[in-house]
Each structure stands twice: as C-alpha cells, then as structure tokens.
Regions:
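Extended intrinsically disordered or low-complexity regions, especially N/C-terminal cytosolic tails and loops
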Residues: 2-6, 10-258, 270-350
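Acidic/aromatic/glycine-rich contiguous surface patches that form carbohydrate-binding/processing clefts
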Residues: 266
Length: 350
C-alpha cells in the first residue's frame, strides 16, 4: 500500500493441541491495537486466523475557533463563545471531549449531540470529575500511609531484620527483587529528602532501613514488594491488619494505586472502567456490598476505600463528603459511575 495509510497484516494459523491454548474454531479473530475479540459465536479448538491491522494517523490540527464552530454544527449549545474558547485553549479540547462524549446521541459515530446538550453541561461534568479526584486522593492518602507503615514495621518486627527490603533472601522471585533494587537505587540517587541525605552522610550501609525506604518509593513499588515477600505468614499478617485475605488485599492495593495515579495525573475517573478488575471478597464478617455491584466502575473502588478507612480511621466522614459532592452536581449520572439505585442501603454504607 502507498499514500496516507499503511496496512500491516499478520496471519497466523495455529492448531489447538492442549488446554493451555484458547483458540477459536473456524472463525476469524480480528483486532485493532486493543485487545482482540472473536467474531460472532467463536468456538474453542481448531484453527483460527489472526489479522492485525494498523493505519497511519492522518488527522490535522484544528484551531479552538474552528472547534467551537464544529460543535455548534453538531448541535451543541454554546451560550458564551468567548468562555468556550478560553476553556478549550487552557484545558485542551482533547481532554474536554471526554466530558462531551456522554452527551452524544446514538449512534455516537454520527457526532450529533442530544437535545438540550450544552458546553456548560460538559464543563460542569469536568468540574465534578476534578472534585471527585480531590476527594478520592484525600481518602487514599490515609490508606497509603497506613500501608507503608504496616509493611515496614510488621516485617521488621517479625524478622528482626530492619534492612529486609534490600535482602534477597526475603523474597520469592529473584528477578523481581533485582528490578526492585534498581528502582530503590534510582530513588535513593534522586531523593532530596533530608533524612536520606543525613543517612548517606552519617552511615556506611549500602541502603537505609525499611522504614526510610518505604517513604521514598512509589506506592506501586511498595505493593509489588509486598507481593514478592517469600514468607506467606508475613503477608497474611500485613493483610490481616486490614481485615483481608492476602489475594484480595494485594488486588485491592493495586486498585488503590491505580486510582491514586489517575487522581495525580488528572485522568478522568468518574465513569471510567477499571483497567484491572478488583478481586471480590466472598466471605467476611465485616459489612460489605452486594454481589450485584459492578467491580468495573469507580463506585466499587470507592467502596474499597471505605473498607480500608473503616479500619484505619473508624470515625471518618467519607460518606458525608461523598454525599455533599454528589448533591452539588445533581445532573451527574451516578449510574454511569456504578452506583446502584439504593447505594446508601448497602451494608457497607449504613
């Protein structure tokens, strides 16, 4: 092919031999750059053809003025053009488009807005999402601090090894440990924290003790360190502090980390699907939510945060803050966030 587009086609014919493969019989399996999906009623076994396609991106830059004109042509109400231009220039249309998308009429590929859709509605949703991120981050901070404290102190207390975080014998997977050491050395080299400077100047040890390291490492790294601890009894004791079995605790801390990162990087969170599905707790003596609540949406993540806070800060006011935020924006579709109709009647929220 020539011109503005390029097509790459890879065809693989594979034979199903064992249960370790999941192939689709007599059906094409076609994907773009995302996860491939089988067409129609694909079946296990037999052969399949895998076709991977990619095209050159050929869209051109559009000025804010042209964008406003295009939005009007697509039937979006814009009461104040100067304000719309200001927001597009200072926020960026690409970011704002995520808040315009829910207002598109079906089929959305026609790019026509539903009746009564306005630019002001999109900005209101944008502000709600911003306040939601601030709310979430404020709650996550308490969980993050508690987790850092638990992992550093419990392992040191149980083993008597204050340098356990840089001791290869403490970990199950050597390759993962080496990657962690590389990250630790990188953080130590770049850290401007006074306590790290003081340690380097005063002591000859290669690495600081765990309670110092845990303060400079990213939350995701700390979570992976937890997962790689060889002694399962230690992992159980850390998870038990938060009322959870090891697999669920590990899964939920990953969700907390991803949500935290979304908040830090100003990513849309209000109606976004979880990149990683949180593990669902099956048996618990503590109040939790019904199985009908979707683990794909942010409400499930909010429930996870509340679980942790009920243990870490028993007299917290998370529910009050959440209700106040939702009351400020009554036009937000909370079902798109995964909220069930009577969410306050769930055992966790009573």
């Amino acid at each position: 092919m020539n011109g503005g587009s390029r097509l790459r086609v890879a065809i693989f014919c594979l034979q199903y031999f064992s249960s370790s493969f999941c192939l689709f019989k007599k059906r094409p399996y076609i994907c773009n750059t995302r996860t491939p999906k089988p067409l129609n009623n694909a079946q296990i076994g037999g052969r399949f053809i895998f076709i991977a396609m990619s095209l050159n991106f050929n869209k051109s830059y559009t000025t804010p003025t042209s964008i406003v004109q295009l939005l009007r042509e697509r039937r979006l109400g814009i009461a104040d053009e100067s304000k719309a231009l200001h927001y597009i220039e200072h926020i960026g249309y690409y970011r704002l488009s995520a808040y315009l998308y829910p207002m598109l009429a079906e089929p959305k590929s026609n790019h026509r807005f539903k009746p009564q859709s306005t630019f002001s509605n999109a900005m209101s949703l944008y502000r709600f999402d911003k306040k939601l991120r601030l709310f979430l981050f404020n709650e996550i901070e308490k969980i993050e601090v508690a987790f850092r404290s638990a992992i550093a102190n419990i392992v040191a207390e149980e083993t008597g090894n204050i340098f356990w975080m840089t001791d290869a014998s403490m970990f199950a997977n050597g390759a993962k440990f080496l990657r962690t050491i590389t990250l630790i050395e990188k953080e130590l080299k770049s850290s401007k924290e006074e306590f790290i400077k003081h340690f380097k100047e005063k002591y000859s040890n290669d690495y600081p003790p765990a309670w110092m390291l845990v303060e400079i490492l990213p939350l995701g790294t700390v979570t992976r360190i937890y997962e790689n601890i060889a002694n399962n009894a230690l992992r159980k004791k850390i998870a038990a502090r938060f009322g959870l079995p090891v697999p669920v605790f590990s899964s939920w801390m990953t969700v907390v980390t991803l949500t935290r990162n979304s908040c830090c990087h100003h990513t849309r969170v209000w109606n976004k699907e979880n990149a990683i599905m949180p593990m669902q707790i099956k048996k618990t003596a503590r109040a939790w939510i019904s199985s009908s609540v979707s683990p794909k949406r942010i409400f499930y993540d909010i429930c996870i945060l509340k679980w942790f806070l009920d243990i870490i800060v028993p007299r917290h006011n998370m529910k009050t803050h959440l209700k106040n935020l939702l009351d400020q924006y009554p036009n937000v579709d909370i079902t798109a966030m995964g909220f069930p109709k009577n969410w306050e009647e769930e055992a966790l929220w009573k």
